[in-house]
UniProtKB/Swiss-Prot annotation:
(2R)-2-phosphoglycerate binds at residues 167, 339, 368-369, 390. One of its GO terms (cellular component) is phosphopyruvate hydratase complex. It comes from Prochlorococcus marinus (strain SARG / CCMP1375 / SS120). The keyword Lyase applies. It is an enzyme of class 4 (lyase). The lineage of its organism: Bacteria, Bacillati, Cyanobacteriota, Cyanophyceae, Synechococcales. Pathway: Carbohydrate degradation; glycolysis; pyruvate from D-glyceraldehyde 3-phosphate: step 4/5. It is found in: Cytoplasm; Secreted; Cell surface. This is Enolase.
Length: 432
């Protein structure tokens, strides 16, 4: 039995470290009276929604304005004095105190990156004090569901310097019997795709999230390549491995029109384009198919495709329960992407996941394009029984770190482990 005094926060430290793009981010450490400690590093996005919590940067010339020394200062000089002496096991209280200390809705005073680093480090310190893995501490004895991975193997948009408008083209190995098998299937298609690209004289350089970033004629060419790679690797498209898209359409939405390819599309035309893709390819999930502010367009998209595929709100919902409730009230989308740094605390993240599940929406735990070796989201996916995780391709160690953590969790769970795809969970559209 652990002594309650062992859970008391003794000290909090922070440091400036680098993310996978070589940009600064913040790492926090929380030390408890009993000797346990927790550490967390915050990721950073490239294509960020306008309604995300505020990521604080230093400005100036150092690190081209992207330094986070002010964030470090806020953690050590303002947050630490307010939290030391409190119990690390009272996550809700810890997060609420930081939110009140900041005093703004989007956390612009202290910075969501400051608050989130401490929030996750606190949870990790408590889990370590109890001698529990993070997924068990945040979850419950029933938390044994391993997520279906959405593997970003072709990068475009803001994540790559190529001519693809859509940001991510993903493999979804839902037909596997275990997470380990799903990872193998994805890796085999990834390497098959690399050879196909090489044989065609196309680049096999990778983008921010570890996927290939070739210059292809259009989005359809990416779909064709993926289907070909799946088949050549020995799998059945649509039965064992399907496709998912992150359109990231806010990035090319200007003056009420969607600018991509050689055209300019209204919301109605954009919906028609997405319907064509769903009919052409084994697509079961579309993320941010329309812009974050195009609510009427989203209503149409959901009406047309909501019963066929998973429609995911990322920039649309930004892991925010207020925006998610608005979407639910208007019957918009049927899934939410969960990014911890979009909202800035672990408590609010868990609230968004809980709301989505209670209202019949699926949830996908997601990385950011600027990632680190921190594997919290792998544990979070299992803890919340989310059923899906999006953490990049099968290359770059900051992406693979999450997959490897899920392999460890699957081993720890043993016979209890259940792969979401094997029991018909995961993205909508698997039965189409």
């Amino acid at each position: 039995m652990i002594d309650s005094l062992d859970l008391v926060i003794d000290s909090i430290f922070a440091r400036e470290v680098l993310d996978s793009r070589g940009n600064p981010t913040v790492e926090a450490e929380v030390l408890l009276e009993g000797g346990a400690k927790g550490r967390a590093i915050v990721p950073s996005g490239a294509s960020t929604g306008a309604y995300e919590a505020h990521e604080l940067r230093d400005g100036g010339t150092r690190y081209m304005g992207k330094g986070v020394l002010r964030v470090v200062e806020h953690i050590e000089d303002r947050i630490a004095p307010s939290l030391c002496g409190l119990s690390a096991s009272d996550q809700v209280n810890v997060d609420q105190i930081m939110r009140e200390l900041d005093g703004t809705e989007n956390k612009e005073n202290l910075g969501a990156n400051a608050i989130l680093a401490v929030s996750i480090a606190t949870a990790r310190s408590a889990a370590n004090a109890f001698g529990m893995p993070l997924y068990r501490y945040l979850g419950n004895p029933m938390s044994s569901l391993l997520p279906v991975p959405l593997m970003n193997v072709i990068n475009g948009g803001a994540h790559a310097a190529n001519n693809l408008d859509f940001q991510e083209f993903m493999l979804v190995p839902h037909g596997a019997e275990s997470f380990r098998e799903a990872l193998r299937m994805g890796a085999e298609v990834f390497h098959t795709l690399k050879k196909l690209l090489s044989d065609k004289g196309l680049s096999t350089a990778v983008g921010d999230e570890g996927g290939f970033a070739p210059d292809l004629e259009n989005n359809n060419a990416a779909g064709d390549l993926l289907v070909q790679a799946i088949e050549k690797a020995g799998f059945r498209p649509g039965e064992e491995i399907s496709l998912a898209l992150d359109v990231a359409s806010t990035e090319f939405f200007k003056n009420g029109l969607y600018h991509f390819g050689e055209g300019k599309f209204s919301s109605e035309k954009m919906v028609e384009e997405l319907k064509k893709l769903v009919n052409l390819y084994p697509i079961i999930s579309i993320e941010d198919g329309l812009s974050e502010d195009d609510w009427s367009g989203w209503e149409l998209l959901t009406k047309e495709l909501g019963n066929k595929v998973q429609l995911v709100g990322d920039d649309l919902f930004v892991t925010n329960t207020k925006r998610l409730r608005q979407g639910i009230d208007r019957s918009i989308a049927n899934s939410i992407l969960i990014k911890v740094n979009q909202i800035g605390t672990l408590t609010e993240t868990l609230e968004a996941i809980d709301l989505s599940h209670r209202m019949g929406y699926t949830s996908i735990i997601s990385h950011r394009s600027g990632e680190t070796e921190d594997t919290t989201i792998a544990d979070l996916a299992v803890a919340t029984r989310a059923g899906q995780i999006k953490t990049g391709s099968l290359s770059r160690s900051e992406r693979v770190a999450k997959y490897n953590q899920l392999l460890r969790i699957e081993d720890q769970l043993g016979a209890q482990a259940v792969y979401a795809g094997s029991v018909g969970l995961g993205p909508r559209g698997l039965s189409k």
